[in-house]
Amino acid sequence: MAAMKSLATAILVVLLLRRLPRGLSQNCSAAIGELMTCGPYVLPGSNGAPSEQCCSALKAVNHGCLCETINIISSLPDHCSLPAVNCAA
């Protein structure tokens, strides 16, 4: 199960980095890559608090980089011709 979580996180990071604008990608790809340490804490069913490594990696990510990455994640369903995800429902 842990291997599947790590693989899913790695795939997501690679996909996100490919969608970032070139300049932003060059500036934040390493920081986003460091967030791989947070993989076990961002998937449904995870338990416990994030590790110190995860928190340090998150602290190091530029706010603009993090927001752009979240926007890209939010746009994925549209780019895949899928209905939008409504997390409030």
Swiss-Prot record:
Listed GO CC annotations: extracellular region
Record Gene3D superfamilies: Plant lipid-transfer and hydrophobic proteins
Subcellular compartments: Secreted
Broad class of the protein's primary localization: secreted
Cystine bridges: C28-C65, C38-C54, C55-C80, C67-C87
PANTHER family: PROTEIN YY1
Record-given protein name: Protein M7
Source organism per UniProt: Lilium henryi
Gene that encodes it: M7
